[in-house]
Amino acid sequence: MAVIRLEVEPLIPTLKNDSICRQAQQFLNIKLERMSEIQFYLISGAEHKKPELQELIGKTGHEVFCDPITSRYQLRSYDLGQHQDPQFVVEVSYKPGVTDNTGHSASEGLKLLEISAEVASGKLYFLHGNLNLGEAQTVAFELLGNELIENVFVYSYKEFFHVDRFSECIFPKVVLKAKLEPETITLNVTNAELEQISLDRCLALTLDEMNVIKNYFENEEVIKKRTTQNLPIWPTDVELEVLAQTWSEHCKHKIFAAKINYSEENIKGYKRLGQQNIGGLYKDLIKNSTKRIEKEQGKDWLISVFSDNAGIVRFDNSIDLCIKVETHNSPSALDPYGGALTGILGVNRDILGCGLGARPIANMDVFCFAPPALAEQIGRDNLPVGPKEPRRILEGVHLGVEDGGNKSGIPTVNGAFFFEENFAGKPLVFVGTVGALPQKLPDGRNTSSKNANSKDRIFMIGGAIGADGIHGATFSSLELNENSPATAVQIGDPLTQKRTSDFLLEARDLGLYSSVTDNGAGGLSSSVGEMATMTGGAEIDLSLCPMKYPGLTPYELMISESQERMTVAVPPLKGEEFLALAKARGVSASDIGEFNQGGYLSIYYGKNLVADLELDFLHDGLPSMNLCAKWDGPRIKESWLKDGLIENKGGKTTIKEGLNSLLSRPNIVSKESWVRRYDHEVQAATHIKFFGI
């Protein structure tokens, strides 16, 4: 397989490099005098020998890889000019298996020129200044790359130029040894061992929940049925992972649904509410209250609440609005850019999967972070272990939401920033999308209703499945620490999502499917598992699912939240037309199974049954969480920060100094420079502009 390297040298300096130099000097106290960068691509062509591939790319490089006015490309060693004589060189590229949008776009561009090749991208950063190795490594890992998802290498000048990087090209490949036989998880163990199983597998299940699962598989009727199916008595890893995903805090909102025994002390000066049992914050105080208000006040504009991927409200006589907001905190703490990008694209997908598919028309966000300068104020060693430092979270999260909206053609129309020290442990990344939904389709169906039918084919459309996104649902229920799983972090692909979105809305108007939902935090487990409740059962074959690379196990295929994926119920007679439209629009579509009325979620890998879960147990078997709440009066807020870590800036000698200090606080200072990076004009429908223009 031929692999060649192409480098793109900018002819115009970028402001980003100047910004990184300022950050290194201001926040890291490192005198980085100048930095330049070069984008590089590794191009792998299975159908071509190396000289032939070099010739092809040499003729077409200006069409795909660079703008000849602002940059130039090279396929062989060349004079580095402005990049000469750096102190250190940093190479940053995505780890194998991590979504590489730049490389993917380049591969798509080559395909348009009838060149079949895989492309991986990366960057070279040339650091100039009186730096030592430790300082160069600090700049590399704090400002240029993220070890969680990227390979970051720091070379001295001599080391870098000693290697002929154009002749020794290795294309990044994921190498996994597939274990296609499911693993049996024996639950006939002690309580301590049950808790350890949950911890080791990142299931986020409590001991009570593990025992409920254990008792289910000890049931004689269950054992009898499983024996006839040639399944082990105890759950397979596929079954246990599906249960953990379905019962996760992310999907079931167990704390919101918990029964609460409330009591209080008789505190003078405060009104007593009295001891009471609350059936759950969600059920009693949110859902029931909403239903009661809807009935008592005749709120006929509430079309769908608490039952779909987003709420649906009536806008006028022909259009309904869909609204969805969601947090994406834990992934954004580990990989700020990827976590936030995944978050905003996720709520876009929720809108696409609402009813029979709505069109996203606006994004919104609220960010709560620790103050950006906290690391400099208290020292990095005093920050919580696990999350990135606050400034990197702010910059990465903002860029992720910016790219998610701008590159998908969805305007960001409102939002907020808030800063407080306690968000150093876990930021709040609150993202939302508004969608427009026609009330009727051309065939007369109500667009707000989903009606999957038995015998409908199960199609998976959009992105392929990878290891990124595994345990996204359960991971978000756990405390962040240095052992948080890297596979729970993924990077979205706005290009694939845009194509999938346009295709889906076209298929909707042609009446090609009966129901749709997104592949949320549990991938096929959540989408097929939820849609199966409409018909009473489903059967799928995981071996039919497209993969980013070979070697994924059945449970990984089932629960991975690969981005830009939807599950669609297609009537049998519409299958060929659905596939033809997908091919014409450049969208991957795979027929992986069928909905039925059997009462089970049956999962195969080829001819082997790897999981068979009763839908009633899967969706209704979760034991209710019981909590006790006691109010014993107001408490003084305590800080996790050690005394003296943050300088007291009070006692300014002049009003001017005090005012300047006040106006520079992160919650008061202008956010205009951040907000203006959002595209709020795309789709040409934003009437009230930011900052009055």
Describe every region a protein language model picked out.
Residues 1-11, 37-44, 84-96, 121-126, ...:
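Short glycine-/aliphatic-rich beta-strand segments at the starts of folded cytosolic domains
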Residues 7-16, 48, 91-102, 129-132, ...:
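Short, surface-exposed ligand-recognition loops at beta-strand->loop->(often short) alpha-helix junctions
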Residues 12-29, 57-58, 98-114, 529, ...:
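Short amphipathic alpha-helix segments
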Residues 19-82:
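Acidic (E/D-rich), amphipathic helical modules within compact regulatory domains
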Residues 25-31, 59-69, 110-116, 138-151, ...:
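A common structural junction motif
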Residues 46-51, 129-136, 569-576:
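Helix N-cap motif at beta-to-alpha junctions
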Residues 63, 67-119:
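Short, solvent-exposed interaction modules
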Residues 97, 117, 122, 128, ...:
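Glycine/proline-enriched, intrinsically flexible loops and inter-domain linkers
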